[in-house]
Amino acid sequence: MSARRSAIFVNTTDTAVANLVVFEVPAGTAIGAAMRELDLPNKGPEAIVCAKDAEGQLKDLSHVPETTATFTAVPANTDDGRAVIRHSCAHVLAQAVQAEFPGTKLGIGPAIENGFYYDFDAAEPFTPEDLKTIEKRMKKIIKTGQKFERRVYESAEAAAEELKNEPYKLELIQDKGNVDPNSDEATEVGAGELTAYDNVNPRTSEVEWSDLCRGPHIPTTRYIPAFALTRSSAAYWRGDQDNAGLQRIYGTAWEDKESLDAYQTMLAEAEKRDHRRLGTELDLFSFPDDLGSGLPVFHPNGGIVRNEMEDHSRRRHIAAGYSFVNTPHITKQDLFERSGHLGFYKDGMFPPMQVDAEFDEDGNVTKPGQEYYLKPMNCPMHNLIFDSRGRSYRELPLRLFEFGNVYRYEKSGVIHGLTRARGFTQDDAHIYCTEDQLEAELTSVLDFILSLLRDYGLDDFYLELSTRDPKKSVGSDEIWERSTEILNRVATNSGLELVPDPEGAAFYGPKISVQARDAIGRTWQMSTVQLDFNMPERFNLEYTSSDGSKQQPIMIHRALFGSIERFFGVLLEHYAGAFPAWLAPHQVMGIPVADDCIPHLETITAQLREKGIRADVDTSDDRMQKKIRNHTTGKVPFMLLAGARDVEANAVSFRFLDGTQVNGVPVDEAIAVISSWIGDRINDQPSEDSIAARR
């Protein structure tokens, strides 16, 4: 029976492939065999590397369905295709490491965003020279065209016997069935059969190497056209610092060399923009060891930027009808039991504190203490504010907002500067409304989010819709279906691209997340809008409706920046340290040609300060050119130069970060230009051309 082919349009984030091929595979026929009649590519960036079944599960091309089934061809230049290539490349990496460093034990090796990694228990840390050696071995393996062949173990005991010299694999086999399906370990074991993948020599049919793995994989190693190892680091087995220390090697793999080159160029640019490095260079923030991991402090320069961010957000929220509240950092255990957080989120919370216990003179407890927790979220406390008095339908929608400090226990291996911290400030809102108001309020909230993000210079967005994880959720099927349908409609009506995130929602409701692309094309999750029919019920929240009956409000969780710290880090990298003038810690710096020009510049900067502009004069002993270099490095958007002619003409010269200059601008005009540029919150850096256009 021949495979039947039909082309359908698929809503996808993959720009290279919008039209994917759907075909039918007869029972007892391998997918790859059925696909041969379709004349689909097996080389190049559109080579078909695997297939997707009707349930969305990826399958090897060697997979043989028991009944006739429909599959979608998955090209290399799609997100799914790249993920399979990267996971297969991780296997090649592990094979190469064990060949070059005999005795090395295997951890896990999943595909991750833009790449892959593999963890190893090695005798010594891997050096840059080691990575070069490993890369050479990998290229040899790829060139031989080894086949990836799936093999099912007869039993867990059979797998354990085969892998008896791989202690980490043995642990995974023992844990089969208890592994989080969303964890990296699920790459190796999970639901279904216990399987291995053998790397088979195509000439001799001998197994060159094998690994415990669920798959799927590419047909042969030749389907890895472009890869690179990027770095090595220390890691803990299963991400737990109480476990064994391992060595992790990271790599990336792509559908062609051009894509790899583009990614490596982006990586080099991202390294220059790393907010941790820029934070030190620009004296914005630090992470003192005395405080502990993931706990930042903001220096005066960073404090200015942060305050400007918060102040603008505060003004916009007030104008949009939000009411500001404030809640404490800790609370009794009972509140988080009531909210459900202890049942569903305890692993992400810091351990409790014992407070108010009483003891006799011998140290015996006479009155047990009360357990308190650092809050990981603000929503339970906002519910208490709503419930502090009777509410009328006339008060709804009620929009409560705060810059609330929260604390979440993140494993040390995932902490990353400001973008993944343990203590941070959420710009957190909770909106209580009626069911009739819900869709309009969600639409208004999403519009407000996008408008405010654009104020800070982000304007390339798409949306993700996260839906229910049946294993981690509360509430009825009906409530989840209804809330998901409403969110989907609001997201679709926004006109932005909508990407599904199956089972990605929190336990209390589905959510929309706003994803923003930065100046170099990276994607950052920004805002979240989460619908919650459940928590109002847990807190018995009520309002009096127009007919006098008591009704339960619907609750919307909304974090716009995600966190102030994270948004700060994203903007810092987006602008490569050169914040827009309205956010910059130092907005104007006067640079005299000679000391006798200092009074002239001090008069100008004094007038600017009266207008609320951050302006200073560099009176150091450095020469003028060094001062220009220093303040260019310091990302000051307006540098004002003054020499004898400027003093005589009551003028000043502009110097900009791009090296351009505008000379002899009358002082009143210069002040007006700077004031309007900052007052209008223009996010572009000023330059000769842009200033000329405003004169």
Curated annotation (Swiss-Prot):
Report if keyword Cytoplasm is assigned.
yes
- Names of required cofactors: Zn(2+)
Q: Which PANTHER family match?
A: THREONINE--TRNA LIGASE, CHLOROPLASTIC_MITOCHONDRIAL 2, THREONINE-TRNA LIGASE
Catalysis: reaction(s): tRNA(Thr) + L-threonine + ATP = L-threonyl-tRNA(Thr) + AMP + diphosphate + H(+)
Instruction: Cite the CDD domains for this sequence.
Output: ThrRS_anticodon, ThrRS_core
Q: What class of enzyme is it?
A: ligase
A Pfam family matched in the record: tRNA_SAD
User: Is Glycoprotein there in the keyword field?
Assistant: no
In the record, what lineage is assigned to the organism producing the protein?
Bacteria, Bacillati, Actinomycetota, Actinomycetes, Mycobacteriales
Cellular component GO terms held in the UniProt record: cytoplasm
| Compartmental location | Cytoplasm
Q: Name one GO molecular function term.
A: tRNA binding
Q: Which InterPro entries match?
A: aa-tRNA-synt_IIb (IPR002314), aa-tRNA-synth_II (IPR006195), aa-tRNA-synth_II/BPL/LPL (IPR045864), Anticodon-bd (IPR004154), Anticodon-bd_dom_sf (IPR036621), TGS (IPR004095), Thr-tRNA-ligase_IIa (IPR002320), Thr/Ala-tRNA-synth_IIc_edit (IPR018163)
Q: What is this protein called?
A: Threonine--tRNA ligase
- SUPFAM superfamilies (alphabetical): Class II aaRS ABD-related, Class II aaRS and biotin synthetases, ThrRS/AlaRS common domain
Give the residue ranges for region: Catalytic: 274-580
Fill in the subunit field for this protein.
Homodimer.
Q: Which residues form a coiled coil?
A: none
Keywords, A to Z, come to: Aminoacyl-tRNA synthetase, ATP-binding, Cytoplasm, Ligase, Metal-binding, Nucleotide-binding, Protein biosynthesis, RNA-binding, tRNA-binding, Zinc
Cofactor info, note text: Binds 1 zinc ion per subunit.
Q: What is an annotated GO biological process for this record, any one?
A: threonyl-tRNA aminoacylation
Q: What does this protein do?
A: Catalyzes the attachment of threonine to tRNA(Thr) in a two-step reaction: L-threonine is first activated by ATP to form Thr-AMP and then transferred to the acceptor end of tRNA(Thr). Also edits incorrectly charged L-seryl-tRNA(Thr).
Limits of the TGS domain: 6-75
> Which EC numbers characterise this protein's activity in its record?
6.1.1.3
Which family is annotated? Answer: Belongs to the class-II aminoacyl-tRNA synthetase family.
